[in-house]
Amino acid sequence: MRPSFLDAEVKRQRDLRLAQLIQQRDQPAALATLAFNALVYPPAHPYHRSATGDSASTAALDSATVRRFWERTVRPARTTVVVTGDISLTEARALLGRWLGAWRPASGDDAVTPPATNPPSQPAKVYLVDKPGAAQSVIRIGGPGVERSDSAYYTIEVMNTLLGGSFSSRLNTTLRETKGYTYGAGSGFSYRPLPGPFVAQASVRTDVTDSSLVEFFREFKLLRDSLVSPEELDRAKSYLALGLAGDFETTGQVAAQLNGLLTYNLPLNYYDQYVPRVMAVTAADVQRVARRLIVPAQYTIVIVGDVEKIRPGIERLGIAPVAVTTAPM
């Protein structure tokens, strides 16, 4: 736990990352995600920028900066070790004592995460990022979601499975199977210590960009306005319940699940409760959560595509004001 951060190695990794950032400029999906986060979250919010940095912040890195960050953030008092596999508690403690027993924090104070407030609600708006000649339009629709600690977590999971969280979801069935606009469409809540984004997304043919938006917003409205059928609800709940075992197939997966419990301060018997609580979700629960969290009138819509071809049709829809922007790089 005493990395040297040699100048040459830091420079090599920095230059590699800068090259990756340049490559992102040619990746519409990456541009859409960067633009979406920057537009949903205000500049002072930690989710406004990519966790992997941008060109300016990356170019400024040197070994002293990296070492200072390490010493302030990676400290014994802030560290939890998860061990899985064919090993006893006694053996694990002995190994940790051998390799980490002498670890002491560097001098100086711990890093302090500045407080952040939830982004304010704002009227829906469409932002276009120009990619001339693009055969497809990359669509991101959504806004701030919820914290992992939200009391309706299980209902949210069921609701999103219905909307866009599985292959048989409404968004994928409509946009892929029925309309043939895309190879896949979906949605999801990003659970984080602060409310991460809710995003519905797809990459669609350029000529059906406006038509795809119509279908997205139709599905949002349907989920809010109508009770889901018993058959569809049972299918979504079974999808989540039966999929749980697949999250524990390897020791790495077991460690990841335990780490999630620790990160979000969940009880160690959380997974004993998971299936019963998922199966207890009702159609009324789903509609109530949809009305609270699926709010199209406040959504940010980001589309990366050929602006000259897609803008007229989107403006004719009248779903929200339209502006052209760029993705932060």
Report the location of each language-model feature.
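A common structural junction motif
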Residues: 1-5, 99-107, 218-228, 317-327
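Short beta-strands and strand-coil junctions in structured, solvent-facing domains, enriched
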Residues: 2-7, 89-90, 102, 106, ...
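Non-catalytic beta-strand/loop surface segments
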Residues: 11, 23-77, 102-150, 161-211, ...
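Divalent metal-coordination and catalytic microenvironments
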Residues: 17, 66, 81, 141, ...
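Non-catalytic, conformational "gating/processing" segments within enzyme and secreted inhibitor domains
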Residues: 63-99, 297-300
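Short hydrophobic/aromatic beta-strand micro-patches
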Residues: 82-84, 201-203, 302-304
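Hydrophobic side chains in well-ordered alpha-helices
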Residues: 92-95, 171, 212, 289, ...
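Small-residue-rich helix-loop
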Residues: 221, 228, 234-241, 245
